[in-house]
């Protein structure tokens, strides 16, 4: 299983707008991805309710994971998005 640990770069954490950006990006990868707090249970990264339910704060470590084909590239792109608090999924890393 591919995994990336990254700190949330959005000051407000994964709430409202940043969560929406992240969920759209996770869906756009076409790869099933989970997201979890470092000490928590993984949830579907493409689910707005699940991502909001994490309550991840700015600066908090999260874990992105997937065992699907194409996971490495998808996780790298999502990790960059989260770490840098970007507005959209980067094309490449």
Swiss-Prot record:
Disulfides per UniProt = none
Keyword Cytoplasm listed: yes
Keywords, in A-Z order: Cytoplasm, Phosphotransferase system, Sugar transport, Transport
Gene3D superfamilies membership: HPr-like (3.30.1340.10)
Q: Which residues form the HPr domain?
A: 2-89
Subcellular location per the Swiss-Prot or TrEMBL entry:
Cytoplasm
User: Does the keyword Signal feature in the UniProt annotation?
Assistant: no
Look up the record and report any one GO term of the cellular component aspect.
cytoplasm
Read off the PANTHER family from this record: PHOSPHOCARRIER PROTEIN HPR, PHOSPHOCARRIER PROTEIN NPR
What does this chain do? General (non sugar-specific) component of the phosphoenolpyruvate-dependent sugar phosphotransferase system (sugar PTS). This major carbohydrate active-transport system catalyzes the phosphorylation of incoming sugar substrates concomitantly with their translocation across the cell membrane. The phosphoryl group from phosphoenolpyruvate (PEP) is transferred to the phosphoryl carrier protein HPr by enzyme I. Phospho-HPr then transfers it to the PTS EIIA domain.
What's the protein name? Answer: Phosphocarrier protein HPr
Q: Which organism is it from?
A: Streptomyces coelicolor (strain ATCC BAA-471 / A3(2) / M145)
Taxon lineage: Bacteria, Bacillati, Actinomycetota, Actinomycetes, Kitasatosporales
Encoding gene per record:
ptsH
